[in-house]
Amino acid sequence: MAVQETAAQLSMALKVQEYPTLKVPYETLNKRFRAAQKNIDRETSHVTMVVAELEKTLSSFPVVDTVVSLLDGVVEKLSALKRKAAESIQAEDESAKLCKRRIEHLKEHSSDQPASVNVWKKKRMDRMMVEHLLRCGYYNTAVKLARQSGIEDLVNIEMFLTAKEVEESLERQETATCLAWCHDNKSRLRKMKSCLEFSLRIQEFIELIRQNKRMDAVRHARKHFSQAEGGQLDEVRQVMGMLAFPSDTHISPYKDLLDPARWKMLIQQFRYDNYRLHQLGNNSVFTITLQAGLSAIKTPQCYKEDGTSKNPDCPVCSKSLNKLAQPLPMAHCANSRLVCKISGEVMNENNPPMMLPNGYVYGYNSLLSIRQDDKVICPRTKEVFNFSQAEKVYIM
């Protein structure tokens, strides 16, 4: 029963952590399916139009050359329809195969072969590291690790590389690439009630003011801000006030609007919307897993100022992770376990806790192992006591 419960918990944890592994390729498949549907519908309508024109012409006894010309047009439209359909099917097939490959990979965790499970765990760790590196901007390192580990089809490199192009264009203070991304994902961004495109148009207006192209700014506003409403309308009113001030004004809020730091805000906004679009969290799975693991073993002993209670085998006690775990909650322990400072063994009925006269507690087996001439030396204070002075501790 306990084994089944543990397996169920592992399966649930896997579903939570591996959600992005399947969600991203599924969303790509869904996007390609919708695009294919639009393309085929458009090409089909073109075929229908030329066929209707051919039928209309045939009803009026046309000359042969006219019919041949119309037939050539029908063949051309049918060829275009066939080509678009083949391209769409191929793109959908690639996405479907990628989804299948990832599902098969996730199924490997339930293998009966320990060696296979260990290989799967190694791949999973590599996947977590690749995603974390991509989020941190180490794209070349992430791509090399994915290639060396053979997991290129198990990680979302393409999505992050696309995001990299957009972010780099915003760093260059260019909006075209990001606007193209918004256009490609227009319907889903609208459902998310994203304001990214509006923010980009606002920034374009600000840049025109900065360049003292005020008439261009007015035309830009008429074109892109006419449909603004609610909070957006208030923002439009605010930026329109910039028309009355020079580009080097020190008057707030126009000085803040002209601050180049707004481009960094746009990068953060794009990153946030991109993660929401693919239903990814703001933190990587590696970060979440690491924090959960640190929190599970974090105790008050890890932060004692004297440092004597720190365990060299405890990750939280190590310098590299101690600060990282500081804001995390302590481990939830319904039943406490006493661990011997000397051996690291659990103190229980087979290894009862023994207290020396100075108040420090160690396991009975450890005191036996360090006893010499019926005396023991406390590892912490270096005080010497008779072995018989150690008293058994009882926990109520």
Curated annotation (Swiss-Prot):
SMART domains: CRA (SM00757), CTLH (SM00668), LisH (SM00667). It holds the Pfam family CTLH. GO terms for cellular component: cytoplasm; cytoskeleton; GID complex; nuclear matrix; nucleoplasm; nucleus; plasma membrane. It catalyses: S-ubiquitinyl-[E2 ubiquitin-conjugating enzyme]-L-cysteine + [acceptor protein]-L-lysine = [E2 ubiquitin-conjugating enzyme]-L-cysteine + N(6)-ubiquitinyl-[acceptor protein]-L-lysine. It is found in: Nucleus matrix; Cell membrane; Cytoplasm, Cytoskeleton. InterPro entries: CRA_dom (IPR013144), CTLH/CRA (IPR024964), CTLH_C (IPR006595), Fyv10_fam (IPR045098), LisH (IPR006594), ZF_RING_GID (IPR044063). It is an enzyme of class 2 (transferase). Its EC number is 2.3.2.27. PROSITE patterns: CTLH, LISH, ZF_RING_GID. It comes from the Eukaryota. One of its GO terms (molecular function) is ubiquitin protein ligase activity. Residues 121-153 form the LisH domain. A zinc finger (RING-Gid-type) spans 314-381. The keyword tRNA-binding does not apply. Keywords: Actin-binding, Cell cycle, Cell division, Cell membrane, Cytoplasm, Cytoskeleton, Erythrocyte maturation, Membrane, Metal-binding, Nucleus, Transferase, Ubl conjugation pathway, Zinc, Zinc-finger. The expected RING-type zinc finger domain is highly divergent and most of the expected Cys residues are not conserved. Still, the protein is required for CTLH complex E3 ubiquitin-protein transferase activity. In addition, the conserved Cys-314 in this highly divergent region is required for ubiquitination by the yeast GID complex, suggesting a direct role in catalyzing ubiquitination. Core component of the CTLH E3 ubiquitin-protein ligase complex that selectively accepts ubiquitin from UBE2H and mediates ubiquitination and subsequent proteasomal degradation of the transcription factor HBP1. MAEA and RMND5A are both required for catalytic activity of the CTLH E3 ubiquitin-protein ligase complex. MAEA is required for normal cell proliferation. The CTLH E3 ubiquitin-protein ligase complex is not required for the degradation of enzymes involved in gluconeogenesis, such as FBP1. Plays a role in erythroblast maturation and in the development of mature macrophages. This is E3 ubiquitin-protein transferase MAEA. It comes from Danio rerio. The lineage of its organism: Eukaryota, Metazoa, Chordata, Craniata, Vertebrata.
